[in-house]
C-alpha cells in the first residue's frame, strides 16, 4: 500500500472540488481523504488531499499515478509526496563525483595522464558491478544510490598503491615489465590485505536483521572484488601502454614533509600510546546510543504546512474477523487514533436506507430511493424496519443478480454505473481482505518515534495477544522504530563483534603476526568511538541504519591505510634503524594515504549535501567525519604504537 499527499495552492471552493474530482479519475487510486471544512486539509492558501493505493511505491501503477499528477502541475500549483518515494539517482551526481575525483587526482598525481588511467580502471569496475546487479533479485534504493560512489572512494587507494610502487621500482630498474612485476609483487600484500578487510567489513552487513544490510553488503563487496581484479589486470596494462606518456606529462605535485612528525612520534611514543589507551577506555565506557534515532530523516515540503498522520497497519488472520470488533472498540478509546479503516468501516460498512441513499448520491451513483427501500424489504421481509442495514456490496450484488426484476426502474446507463461501482468495490475490498489475512489501517496523530508512540504500540500488541487467535503482524514506520529501539544495542554489538573478528583474521593472515591485527583493529575501533563522541558533541541525531552501515564501512576501509603504513615499516626495518624506517614509511605512504583519504572525505562530504534523500546524505557525511578521524589516528598515533612494539611487530611471525 502507498499513501500520496497532494498539496495544491491558491484554490477557491469550486476549484477544490474540481481537483477532488480529477484526482478521483486517476486509475489505481482507491480512496481520497479530503474535507472542505476541516483545518486538517485546509491551511492558509494550501489544500491537502490524501490518496491511497494498494500498490507499492516502486510499482508501475504508482509511476503512472505520478505521471498523472505531474500533468496536473501544468494547470495548478501542485506538489506531491509519497510515504516511501523512490526516485532515480540523477546521472549528474555520478558526473559530479567523478569531477571532484579528477580535480583531486590532477592536483595530487605526478603526471597529467595518471588520473585518466585511474578513472578508466575504476570506471570499468563500476560499470561491471552495476551490470552484475541485474543478477540479483532486487537492489534497494539506498544501495542503488550510493553503491557507485562508495565503490569509487573505497577502491581508489589500491590504484594509487600500485602506481606508486611501480614508480619506486622504475627508479631501480629500467625495464618496464620487470618493474611492473616487482610492483605487483611488493604491493600485493598491502592491496590484498586492504581489499579483503574492506570486503569482510562489508560482508559483515549481511548479519544485519534488515534486508538493506544484505543488499548493501553484497553489492559493495562485489564491487570491491571487481575493482581488485581490474587493478591487477586493467591498470598494469594501461600503465605499461602509456608509460612514455606518463613520464612525458610529468608535473610537480604536493609533497608533505612528515619528518618532524616521525621524530615526534618516536620521541613521545610512551605518552602518545598511553594517551591512546586512556582515550579508548574512556570512550568505550561513555559511548552511548543516545545519538541514535530510529525515525528516517525526511525533507518534506508538505509536512511544513500539514502534520501527516502516522499510519499503522494490523495484519490478522481472517478467522479472527468476529474478534476484530473488540480491537476496533479498544482503538476508538484512544484520542490520538483519528481513523480506523477496515473492510467493516469502509466498503463493508452497513447503512440504513437513508444513509445508503445519501452515500450513493455522494458517489454519483443515482439509484432511486424507492428501489433501495424495496431491496431492503425484499431481503429483510417481515423483519424490516428503519434500523435495518445493508452494505453497499450487498445492495449492488442484489441488483446485479436480480437485474431482470429492475428493468422498468433501472436504465442501461444506470446499470453500467452499478457494474462499474461493483468492480470498484471488489478492488477496494482486496485492499482490506485477502485469502488468508485481512488488515486494519490505523491512522494516528502519534509521532513516528516517541515514548507515547511506543507505549501505544506496546498496549495494542498486548490487546491483540489477548483478543486474537493465531498470527498477527504490525506494519509501519513506527513499528520498525519500536522493534529497533528494543534491539539496537544487540544489533550494534553483534555487528561490531562480527566485523572485528573478520577483519582481525584477515590482518592476522596478511602479516602473520598476532600483535599487528590487535593494534590496527583497536585503532580503527577507537576511531568509531570518537566518531560517536563527535556526533554527540555536535548534538546530532543519527539514523540507526546509518550508524550500523558506516561502522562496517569505516572498519573495513580505513584500516587499509594502517595496513599500508605498517607494511612499509616492516619492510624498511629489515635494513634500517627505527628512526630511518619511520621517516621513510611516512615518505612512502603519505602520498597514497593523503590522496585516497582526501578523495573519500571530500567526495562523501560534498555529495552529502547533493543527495535529495536526507538518509543517504547522512551516511555520506558520517563517512567523511569518520574517515577524517581514522586518518588522524593512523598518522599521529599508530607510528608511536608501532615504534613502542617494534620488536614484536618486526620479528613476531608465525608460519601460515
Question: Positions of the model-derived regions?
Answer:
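Extracytoplasmic
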Residues: 15-111, 123, 397-505
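Extended, charge-rich low-complexity interaction segments
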Residues: 58, 65, 363-401, 504-508
Amino acid at each position: 500500500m502507498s499513501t500520496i499527499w497532494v498539496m495544491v495552492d491558491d484554490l477557491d471552493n469550486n476549484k477544490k472540488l474540481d481537483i477532488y474530482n480529477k484526482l478521483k479519475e486517476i486509475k489505481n487510486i482507491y480512496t481520497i481523504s479530503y474535507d472542505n471544512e476541516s483545518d486538517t486539509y485546509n491551511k492558509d492558501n494550501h489544500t491537502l488531499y490524501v490518496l491511497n493505493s494498494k500498490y507499492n511505491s516502486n510499482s508501475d501503477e504508482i509511476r503512472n499515478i505520478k505521471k498523472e499528477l505531474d500533468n496536473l502541475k501544468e494547470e495548478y500549483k501542485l506538489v506531491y509526496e509519497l510515504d516511501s518515494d523512490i526516485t532515480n539517482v540523477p546521472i549528474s551526481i555520478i558526473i559530479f563525483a567523478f569531477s571532484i575525483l579528477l580535480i583531486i587526482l590532477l592536483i595530487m598525481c605526478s603526471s597529467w595522464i595518471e588520473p585518466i588511467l585511474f578513472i578508466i580502471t575504476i570506471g570499468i569496475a563500476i560499470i561491471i558491478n552495476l551490470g552484475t546487479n541485474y543478477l540479483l533479485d532486487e537492489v534497494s534504493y539506498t544501495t542503488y544510490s550510493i553503491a557507485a560512489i562508495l565503490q569509487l572512494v573505497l577502491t581508489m587507494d589500491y590504484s594509487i598503491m600500485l602506481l606508486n610502487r611501480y614508480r619506486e621500482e622504475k627508479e631501480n630498474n629500467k625495464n618496464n615489465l620487470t618493474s611492473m612485476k616487482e610492483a605487483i609483487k611488493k604491493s600485493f600484500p598491502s592491496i590484498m590485505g586492504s581489499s579483503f578487510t574492506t570486503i569482510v567489513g562489508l560482508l559483515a552487513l549481511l548479519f544485519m536483521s534488515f534486508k538493506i544490510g544484505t543488499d548493501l553488503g553484497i553489492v559493495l563487496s562485489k564491487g570491491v572484488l571487481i575493482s581488485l581484479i581490474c587493478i591487477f589486470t586493467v591498470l598494469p596494462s594501461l600503465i605499461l601502454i602509456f608509460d612514455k606518456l606518463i613520464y612525458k606529462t610529468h608535473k610537480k605535485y604536493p609533497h608533505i614533509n612528515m619528518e618532524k612528525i616521525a621524530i615526534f612520534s618516536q620521541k613521545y611514543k610512551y605518552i602518545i600510546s598511553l594517551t591512546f589507551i586512556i582515550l579508548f577506555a574512556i570512550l568505550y565506557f561513555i559511548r552511548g546510543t543516545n545519538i541514535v534515532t530510529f525515525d528516517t530523516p525526511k525533507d518534506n515540503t508538505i509536512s511544513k504546512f500539514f502534520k501527516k498522520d502516522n499510519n499503522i497497519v494490523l495484519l490478522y488472520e481472517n478467522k479472527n474477523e468476529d474478534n476484530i470488533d473488540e480491537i476496533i472498540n479498544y482503538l476508538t478509546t484512544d484520542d490520538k487514533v483519528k481513523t480506523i479503516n477496515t473492510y467493516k468501516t469502509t466498503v463493508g460498512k452497513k447503512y440504513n436506507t437513508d444513509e445508503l441513499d445519501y452515500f450513493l448520491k455522494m458517489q454519483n451513483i443515482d439509484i432511486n430511493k424507492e428501489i433501495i427501500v424495496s431491496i431492503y424489504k425484499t431481503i429483510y421481509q417481515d423483519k424490516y424496519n428503519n434500523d435495518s442495514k445493508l452494505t453497499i456490496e450487498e445492495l449492488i450484488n442484489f441488483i446485479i443478480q436480480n437485474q431482470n426484476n429492475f428493468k422498468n426502474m433501472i436504465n442501461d446507463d444506470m446499470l453500467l454505473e452499478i457494474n462499474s461501482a461493483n468492480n470498484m468495490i471488489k478492488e477496494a475490498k482486496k485492499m482490506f481482505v485477502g485469502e488468508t489475512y485481512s488488515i486494519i489501517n490505523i491512522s494516528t496523530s502519534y509521532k513516528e518515534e516517541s515514548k507515547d508512540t511506543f507505549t501505544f504500540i506496546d498496549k495494542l500488541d498486548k490487546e491483540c495477544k489477548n483478543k486474537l487467535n493465531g498470527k498477527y503482524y504490525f506494519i509501519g514506520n513506527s513499528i520498525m522504530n519500536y522493534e529497533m529501539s528494543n534491539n539496537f544495542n544487540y544489533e550494534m554489538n553483534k555487528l561490531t563483534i562480527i566485523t572485528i573478528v573478520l577483519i582481525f583474521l584477515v590482518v592476522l593472515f596478511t602479516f602473520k603476526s598476532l600483535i599487528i591485527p590487535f593494534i590496527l583493529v583497536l585503532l580503527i575501533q577507537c576511531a568509531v568511538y570518537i566518531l560517536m563522541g563527535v556526533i554527540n558533541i555536535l548534538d546530532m541525531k543519527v539514523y540507526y541504519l546509518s550508524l550500523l552501515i558506516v561502522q562496517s564501512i569505516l572498519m573495513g576501509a580505513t584500516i587499509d591505510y594502517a595496513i599500508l603504513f605498517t607494511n612499509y615499516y616492516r619492510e624498511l626495518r629489515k635494513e634500517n634503524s627505527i628512526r630511518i624506517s619511520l621517516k621513510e614509511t611516512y615518505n612512502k605512504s603519505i602520498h597514497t594515504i593523503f590522496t585516497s583519504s582526501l578523495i573519500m572525505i571530500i567526495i562523501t562530504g560534498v555529495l552529502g549535501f547533493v543527495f535529495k534523500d536526507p538518509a543517504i546524505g547522512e551516511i555520506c557525511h558520517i563517512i567523511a567525519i569518520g574517515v577524517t578521524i581514522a586518518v588522524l589516528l593512523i598518522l599521529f598515533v599508530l607510528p608511536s604504537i608501532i615504534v613502542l612494539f617494534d620488536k614484536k611487530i618486526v620479528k613476531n611471525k608465525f608460519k601460515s
